[in-house]
């Protein structure tokens, strides 16, 4: 359990202030061995599905690997766990607590009226908009913040800045970049107007002032 708590702190808890954790963290954290849950099949039989890393149930966060298996977790495993945990924390639990006032400059870059019509689809990336067709400007702003947060915490800077158009098979990176939804988004070939990089810098600064270093989370366990 000691080793398990150590990696939970390193990949998750240590990246948030005590105030944020006290305010938004689940009421109970359980360090378990193997977390599984069951669901009924069409035949009414019970099927068991293993949750490899963690589960959030009834305001309780339950972690697996409370035994010797924690020693077998690879960097790839830890990178995946890290992404899932921080996406849950930063794009679900903390949404209502985002530092909105500090994000005004970030939100001023994009003309959100263009996110409401597919007629502007070809302009979206130039506007710094990474989402899909929005229902309203307010909804677009909320989605925009969450999308940038997800991009930064799940994608190392090296992958964000890579020129995906210059990589082809059999370059080993050809397969690596396929694991990253946001690969190349900060490269000029995709960020043609520089607005994605501009918004990247603004949201990183706003969240850092808030006490969360998004790029540090993005680099964690990246090889």
Residue ranges and their predicted role:
Residues 9, 13, 17, 86-95, ...:
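Sec-exported extracytoplasmic/periplasmic mature domains
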Residues 14-31, 99-104, 214-222:
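Short glycine-rich, low-complexity/disordered patches
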Residues 42-52, 61-72, 198-219:
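Structured domain cores in non-transmembrane regions
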Residues 58-112:
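Active-site recognition of the HExxH zinc-binding catalytic motif
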Residues 110-223:
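Metalloprotease/metallohydrolase-associated module, dominated by Zn2+-dependent proteases
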């Amino acid at each position: 359990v000691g080793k398990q708590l150590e990696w939970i702190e390193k990949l998750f808890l240590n990246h948030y202030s005590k105030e944020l954790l006290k305010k938004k963290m689940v009421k109970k954290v359980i360090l378990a061995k193997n977390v599984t849950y069951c669901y009924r099949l069409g035949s009414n039989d019970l099927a068991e599905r293993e949750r490899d890393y963690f589960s959030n149930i009834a305001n309780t966060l339950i972690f697996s690997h409370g035994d010797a298996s924690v020693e077998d977790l690879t960097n790839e495993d830890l990178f995946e766990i890290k992404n899932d945990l921080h996406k849950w924390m930063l794009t679900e639990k903390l949404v209502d607590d985002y530092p909105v006032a500090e994000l005004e400059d970030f939100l001023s870059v994009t003309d959100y009226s263009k996110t409401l019509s597919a007629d502007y689809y070809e302009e979206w990336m130039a506007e710094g908009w990474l989402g899909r067709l929005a229902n309203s400007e307010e909804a677009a702003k909320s989605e925009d913040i969450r999308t940038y947060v997800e991009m930064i915490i799940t994608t190392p800077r090296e992958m964000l800045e890579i020129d995906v158009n210059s990589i082809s098979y059999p370059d080993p990176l050809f397969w690596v970049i396929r694991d990253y939804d946001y690969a190349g988004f900060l490269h000029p070939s995709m960020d043609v107007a520089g607005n994605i990089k501009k918004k990247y810098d603004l949201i990183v600064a706003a969240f850092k002032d808030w006490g969360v270093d998004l790029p540090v989370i993005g680099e964690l366990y990246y090889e």
